Amino acid sequence: MGVFTYETEFTSVIPPPRLFKAFILDADNLIPKIAPQAVKCAEIVEGDGGVGTIKKITFGEGSQFGSVTHKIDGIDKENFVYSYSLVEGDALSDKIEKISYETKLVASSDGGSVIKSTSNYHTKGDVEIKEEHVKAGKEKASHLFKLVEDYLLANPNEYC
């Protein structure tokens, strides 16, 4: 099994505490509300929403995938770090065993946030992950992030 790591960085004018509440802690409610074409719904299959919780994410009709299941590996509300692993679903091919993600929000000097995301693709055998595959996923994540940021800017009293 090989592991391929990719890192991404975004910036936002939204401070980490507010962005973490919306983009991480309440994503299961907010994203289907503002981007139903991307995510139809999210439901807890097992657990209480904390570490170890298993969630099923059903994608919207505009997605190339039907659903995925992920397991929450870590939530650090004080340092704004969230990690989870994609463990099941049609986004995983016969070449990928799982994908682990870590998102960390860091305060920027202008009062906003720097969002640092690390993706670890755990492959079956000696398979290599093509950059195009990763780039497409990064673009979708960037688009969802921008929608959340726009929502927070338009609704300054939410997630305070």
Curated annotation (Swiss-Prot):
Enzyme Commission number(s) of this protein: 3.1.27.-
Pfam families referenced in this protein's UniProt entry, alphabetically: Bet_v_1
Q: Which InterPro entries match?
A: Bet_v_I/MLP (IPR000916), Bet_v_I_allergen (IPR024949), Plant_def-hormone_signal (IPR050279), START-like_dom_sf (IPR023393)
Q: Name one GO cellular component term.
A: cytoplasm
Tissue and organ expression note: Highly expressed in roots. Expressed a low levels in ripe red fruits.
- Mind listing the UniProt keywords for this protein, alphabetically? Allergen, Hydrolase, Nuclease, Pathogenesis-related protein, Plant defense
One GO MF annotation is:
signaling receptor activity
Q: Which GO terms describe its biological process?
A: abscisic acid-activated signaling pathway; defense response
Q: What does this protein do?
A: Possesses ribonuclease activity in vitro.
Instruction: Write out the similarity annotation.
Output: Belongs to the BetVI family.
Among PANTHER family, the record links this protein to:
OS08G0374000 PROTEIN-RELATED, STRESS-INDUCED PROTEIN SAM22
Q: What is this protein called?
A: Major strawberry allergen Fra a 1.06
Q: Which gene encodes it?
A: Fra a 1.06
